[in-house]
Amino acid sequence: MSSILIKNGLVVDTEWMRHYDILISGSKIQRVAPSIDYSTLPHDTTVVRADGLCVLPGIIDAHTHYHLVSRGTVTADSFEEGSRLAAYGGVTTVVDFADDNKVSLLDSLHQRRKEMVPMAIDYALHQGVYKYRPDIKKELESIKRAGIGTLKIFTTYKDVGYLVDDREELKTIFKDAKDLGLMVSVHCEDDKIVTELSSSWKGQYRPIDHAALRPAEAEAAAIEYVGGIAAELDMPVYIVHLSSRKGLESVRKLRMQGVKVIVETTPHYLFLTKEKLEGPEGPLYVMTPPLRTEDDNEALQEALVNGEI
């Protein structure tokens, strides 16, 4: 395989920025130095002049939903299109999700990997677990052997079969994951709160109402629920797409109790507010959890800067 020499770029590392040359061979960085002599390299080495440009490590996006099939529709980006767009934006690795929608978790994983063949960048998968099985530990063992390191659990969406609503069954899944060295990540919204609000709702179902029907209190309650299970088992828990100050306060409360809570958020919860749900373009901003307030934006931004997220 031919080599690539990136010349005189401003290389950005965690602690420093310097003008360096980078030699890449076999898709791996072989050497980083102030100056690499082209004449010492194979004759077919490609030289990329990076004068005046920054050279950064590729971004890893640990939460993507390409070609997600749900409720009779599918997300806009295919694996091929989405991964090419990611590459143009500097994202070189994504971690998507295998649904729990086949006879076994391993079957679901194999099917998802077949669908991901057109990917233009590196990828991995989290495995969704949407229902309890008596042989759940054997199933988890099989997907771990197949390369899975992270599970995805929901505390909502009972109506579409994503919710393991029996606490002891959910605790068993957590314990088996701990025994096998698997991380459990959780979409946190309390389904009871969401369901009760929806069933008693007297107004219309407009995009802006989505924020009222899935409030920050639901996120906070679910975080404390799964955090309690993690505390009982002395294991970490990973909260995906944190959206609110109240949710952040629940995370802080758990951490004060000694629970290891890992948290991610997303650009839309950092910078957009529920006002985007108003008007003719409102449907384009419907997501779950919903967009919140400017106060929530500011709380998450501060937590990101200080390392809580």
Predicted regions and their residues:
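N-terminal metal-binding scaffold of metallo-dependent hydrolase/deaminase domains
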Residues: 1-42
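Divalent metal-coordination and catalytic microenvironments
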Residues: 9, 22, 27, 52, ...
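Active-site metal-binding motif and surrounding structural segment of the metallo-beta-lactamase
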Residues: 37-56
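Metal-associated gating/positioning segment near the N- to mid-region
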Residues: 51-118
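Short, acidic/polar
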Residues: 75-83, 133-143
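Short catalytic-loop micro-motif centered on adjacent basic/acidic residues
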Residues: 94-96, 124-127, 236-241
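A glycine-rich helix N-cap at a beta->alpha junction
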Residues: 115-129
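Histidine/acidic residue-rich metal-binding segments in metalloenzymes
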Residues: 135-309
